[in-house]
Amino acid sequence: MRKFTTLTSIAAPLNETNIDTDIIFPARFLLIMDKLGLGKYAFNERRNTGIKGSNFVLDTPPYLGSEILVTGARFGIGSSREQAVWALTDLGIRCIIAPSFGDIFYANCLNNGLLPIEFNGAEYQLVMQAANEAEPITIDLATQTLTASNICLLYTSPSPRDKRQSRMPSSA
């Protein structure tokens, strides 16, 4: 995963709660051990419906190539399936914004250079609105800010202990 100090991308809105790691990376692909190429299996049941083309948010303009994903609460719950994070990073996702994450998924994000950011309440609604309107969002690690056209929010980065124990870039 490429490190960054700032990231600007249109954020893809996935306004759904309780997305577990089996939805992100289905169990039938668990025997694939090479991290490269796992992105094609991310959200497989939702992206590969058998119909020509997919209407899944990450497959539709203007969200094709989004590096930021804004999701509902409890994203990444369920098993300790690290392949879910590998699939997301291989798909090009570099930051996930949600009200909450599964604990093991959160740790796996930190260990694999995928930035998880938690926002709740009105702040979360502003970020989701920006994503729904396909506004570019900028994440700045040095200032710990998220900005879009009409918002500037401070976020709490992973703790220094979490950064030391992971491969997340530090803001220094």
Place the predicted regions along the sequence by residue.
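N-terminal, positively charged, Ser/Thr/Ala/Gly-biased leader segments
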Residues: 1-26
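Acidic active-site catalytic centers that drive phospho-/nucleotidyl reactions
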Residues: 17, 140, 162
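Feature captures the catalytic cores and cofactor-binding loops of soluble hydro-lyases/lyases
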Residues: 25, 31-141
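Short polybasic amphipathic segments
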Residues: 143-149
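Conserved small/polar residues in nucleotide/adenosyl-binding loops
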Residues: 155-162
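Hydrophobic alpha-helical segments, chiefly the membrane-spanning helices
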Residues: 166-172
